[in-house]
């Protein structure tokens, strides 16, 4: 029996409550507690799938992984009596996997988007459309937020509650192509964004600090000195004029005009004040570590050389992409299997 924990979103459970009428089979939602929930705040940053993707390191890692995965062609093969194989081009599933997954949905785009779903939320879903012979003729992508896996207490059967634009229905497991990421219960995967939420929030906080750092022309670059005492009204007038003329990005580089024997002495930014730059670099590496993406693939060439980039790229395909290819291949063989394929 699977752990009974709360659903990814209370609204979704509310939408599905009518499906579990009195007398229905007792069931439990099979949902991961490690996911980003609406309104989640961490380090003063609102963190969800949308805001996390606005962090450049997250976008770059997911982008390169999803595009690289989708760029590799997917073919359906038929086993022959002599043990060899050939492409099963006459099978409807061949075109679904290789060319067009559904109306207005190229196979490339289906793979790319579903891989993004796995890399962000930990799970990707598509509904199988079958013909009269039971062959898969379409794969209709489902948004993970609209799918709630559940398990029957008595039989252990997995099924899926789906909310399609307000239309609620159940689908048996054999009608769903479900690609989970790394998980703990054998059904669903952890959300990578949720697992990396502290690293992401720290990176986003450092970006916010950088925005504020430069918002008013960065930190003070110098001080005004005078040998004459200033009265309160003169001091207030000086502050107001200085802010109006020299603060802000639009006034950056303006020529400073001083009066009354005042002098401007430049000061440098101390290491503590500039530390956020190092924090931003480290957080980029931290996100790349979560996704096992070499830094040069997300445009960070600081530690790369001509000789090691080639080896890093080979390692990327062997240690990062190959597990994804195997995962998809085996789940598709299990869930899209046809007798002659």
Language-model-derived ranges and their functions:
Residues 1-276, 280-282, 286-289, 293-296, ...:
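Structured, contiguous alpha/beta core segments that scaffold functional sites
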Residues 325:
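Short amphipathic alpha-helical/adjacent loop interface patches that line ligand
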Residues 252, 311, 331:
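Active-site lining segments that contact anionic ligands and/or coordinate catalytic metals
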Residues 317-318, 322, 333:
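Conserved nucleotide- and phosphate/pyrophosphate-binding catalytic cores
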Residues 334-341:
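Residue-level detector of conserved catalytic or cofactor/ligand-binding positions
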Residues 303-319:
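Short amphipathic alpha-helical segments at helix boundaries and their inter-helical linkers
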């Amino acid at each position: 029996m699977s752990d009974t924990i709360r659903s990814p979103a209370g609204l979704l459970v509310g939408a599905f409550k009518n499906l579990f009428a009195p007398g229905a089979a007792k069931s439990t939602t099979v949902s991961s507690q490690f996911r980003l929930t609406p309104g989640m705040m961490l380090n003063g940053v609102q963190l969800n799938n949308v805001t996390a993707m606005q962090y450049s390191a997250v976008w770059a890692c997911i982008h390169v992984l999803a595009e690289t995965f989708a760029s590799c062609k997917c073919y359906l093969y038929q086993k022959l009596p002599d043990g060899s194989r050939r492409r099963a081009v006459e099978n409807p599933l061949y075109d679904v996997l290789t060319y067009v997954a559904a109306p207005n949905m190229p196979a490339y785009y289906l793979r790319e988007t579903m891989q993004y779903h796995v890399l962000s939320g930990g799970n990707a879903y598509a509904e199988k459309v079958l013909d009269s012979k039971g062959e898969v003729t379409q794969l209709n992508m489902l948004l993970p937020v609209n799918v709630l896996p559940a398990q029957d207490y008595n039989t252990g059967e997995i099924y899926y509650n789906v909310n399609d634009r307000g239309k609620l229905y159940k689908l048996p497991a054999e009608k769903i192509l479900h690609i989970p990421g790394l998980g703990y219960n054998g059904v669903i995967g952890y959300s990578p964004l949720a697992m990396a939420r502290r690293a992401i929030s720290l990176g986003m906080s450092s970006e916010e600090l950088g925005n504020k750092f430069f918002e008013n022309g960065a930190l003070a670059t110098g001080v005004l000195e005078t040998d004459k005492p200033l009265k309160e009204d003169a001091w207030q007038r000086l502050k107001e004029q200085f802010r109006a003329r020299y603060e802000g990005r639009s006034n950056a580089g303006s020529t400073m005009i001083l009066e009354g024997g005042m002098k401007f002495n430049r000061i440098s930014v101390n290491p503590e004040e500039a530390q956020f730059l190092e924090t931003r670099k480290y957080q980029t590496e931290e996100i790349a570590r979560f996704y096992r993406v070499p830094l040069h693939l997300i445009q960070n060439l600081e530690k790369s050389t001509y000789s090691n980039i080639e080896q890093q790229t080979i390692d990327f395909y062997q240690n990062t992409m190959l597990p994804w290819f195997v995962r998809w291949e085996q789940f598709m063989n299990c869930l899209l299997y046809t007798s002659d394929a």
